[in-house]
Amino acid sequence: MLADHQIPEQSMDEEERTSSRGWMREFKYPSNLRDITEEARISLSSVAHCGGVDELLHESSELAWRTNMSPPHRALFTFSKKTDISYVMLFLDYSRDESYCPQEVRIDLGDGTNDWWLKMYRRVDQPKGWVKIPIHDAFGNPLRVMSLQMTIMKNHEKGRDCVVRHFRVLGPFRSRYDSMNRMILGPSAVLEARPGTEPIKDAIMNHYQSMR
């Protein structure tokens, strides 16, 4: 449950950029994506006072996940079915959090907590804002998983606890595995995963609808 917090006033532009919806500004075609974070069951390896799942998912970056143990720190996202994932988005702020700010992150992907089949590593130096981590195969398609785990391996300045201000999981707006997509588009169903191809796909869909 969220405690009472005094959230500083910000300009509307800055408030939007730093909000949980601010990830949209990192993409040319944000309408191709959707936020699927809250479709998952989320568990955190440790939580400091007033810094748990509710704070991690809060709209404001003034609230955050705050850990309460030595690293590594883990956030586990478990989906109820196989789910297409396109990006993991982190909002980190070294200027505010300093030694609490993550520097080395690992993303594990799999079909369960005992079946991790891909590990991805990312290092960020003194980030201030959104960090984009693509979750794609060699052809640029989203990866289909049931579980995703972020492990914070190391903080800046060898800090112990960490602060993560936003964590969002993004999937494609339309899955290439949708039965309607496969029936109408055939091989073109993969277009939804490619940046800038939404107009092509819409044209195909509109043609189909006009012929029914």
From Swiss-Prot:
Biological process (GO), any one: protein K11-linked ubiquitination
SMART domains: APC10
Pathway: Protein modification; protein ubiquitination
Matches recorded under InterPro entries: APC10/Doc1, APC_su10/DOC_dom, Galactose-bd-like_sf
Gene deletion effect: RNAi-mediated knockdown results in both viable and inviable embryos, but eventually animals display germline maintenance defects and become sterile.
Pfam families (alphabetical): ANAPC10
Summary of subunit composition and partner proteins: The APC/C complex is probably composed of at least 12 subunits: apc-2, apc-10, apc-11, cdc-26, emb-1, emb-27, emb-30, mat-1, mat-2, mat-3, such-1 and gfi-3.
Protein name: Anaphase-promoting complex subunit 10
Natural source organism: Caenorhabditis elegans
Lineage summary: Eukaryota, Metazoa, Ecdysozoa, Nematoda, Chromadorea
Protein encoded by which gene: apc-10
